């Protein structure tokens, strides 16, 4: 019986993959995902696989692309679809899971370490009192969230909604004073963490896919 696994590989570094995901990759005959996911999987295989054939790979991003690939290749007995971070936090897992369910395809989801969990740990703080949101490929009004009383926000950024642009919007909305911490290339060797006020970081260039922590520390607001 064919096994389809939707796996979260963690924030990026191969070292932060769960053992369950490592084993799934090692025992797969086909891997599907974005190039960055393939790179992490290749590092895992290189480290752990000592014999046998390497799995084939296919680059696919959209849920319909993955579903089509699975439909066309009945010879795949153990296909693993790779997603960054955790499978349940702003992941492509949701759309693919809905599509597979609709088409009667059985699958299993393997969780991973989320970028938020990793970033919070690096900063030595908790995240259970924070709002988790995304501005990657969608709009999110951080200023409105702060006005409504939210004091801590973890925000995924990307595309036109980068960290520098976020800080510009916050400053223009009267929140130039809030503390902003930007995590770039989290978990990689060239990881960079930058901290400052929204005003001081306004318009700066950051990695397209960065994670931002916004903190309102002014008790008078």
Question: Where is each model-derived feature located?
Answer:
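Class I S-adenosyl-L-methionine
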Residues: 1-108, 113, 117, 210
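A contiguous loop/helix-start segment that scaffolds small-molecule binding in enzyme catalytic cores
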Residues: 2-6, 78-79, 149-221
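Short gly/pro/ser/thr-enriched loop/turn and capping motifs at secondary-structure boundaries
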Residues: 38-40, 114-118, 139-140, 162-163, ...
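Short, well-ordered secondary-structure micro-motifs
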Residues: 44, 93, 119-122, 143-145, ...
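Short amphipathic alpha-helix with an adjacent loop that forms part of the alpha/beta core around
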Residues: 67-74, 142-148, 199-204
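Short, hinge-like loop/turn segments at secondary-structure boundaries
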Residues: 99, 124-128, 197-200
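Short, glycine-/small-residue-rich phosphate/pyrophosphate-handling segment
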Residues: 120-149, 158
């Amino acid at each position: 019986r064919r096994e389809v696994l939707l796996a979260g590989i963690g924030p990026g570094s191969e070292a932060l993959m769960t053992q369950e995901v490592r084993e799934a990759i090692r025992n797969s005959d086909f891997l599907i995902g974005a190039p960055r996911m393939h790179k992490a999987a290749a590092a895992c295989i290189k480290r752990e696989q000592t014999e046998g054939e390497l799995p084939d790979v296919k680059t696919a991003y959209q849920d319909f692309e993955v579903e089509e690939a699975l439909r066309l290749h009945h010879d795949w007995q153990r296909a693993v679809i790779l997603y960054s971070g955790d499978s349940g936090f702003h992941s492509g897992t949701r759309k693919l899971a809905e599509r597979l369910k609709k088409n009667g395809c059985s699958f299993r989801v393997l969780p991973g370490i989320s970028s938020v969990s990793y970033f919070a740990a690096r900063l030595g703080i908790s995240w259970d009192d924070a709002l988790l949101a995304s501005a990657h490929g969608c709009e999110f009004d951080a200023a409105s969230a702060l006005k409504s009383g939210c004091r801590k926000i973890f925000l995924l950024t990307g595309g036109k909604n980068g960290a520098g642009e976020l800080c510009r919007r916050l400053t223009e909305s009267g929140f130039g004073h809030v503390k902003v911490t930007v995590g770039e290339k989290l978990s990689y060797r060239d990881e960079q963490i930058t901290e400052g006020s929204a005003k001081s970081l306004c318009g700066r260039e950051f990695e397209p896919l960065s994670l931002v922590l916004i903190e309102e520390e002014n008790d008078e607001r």
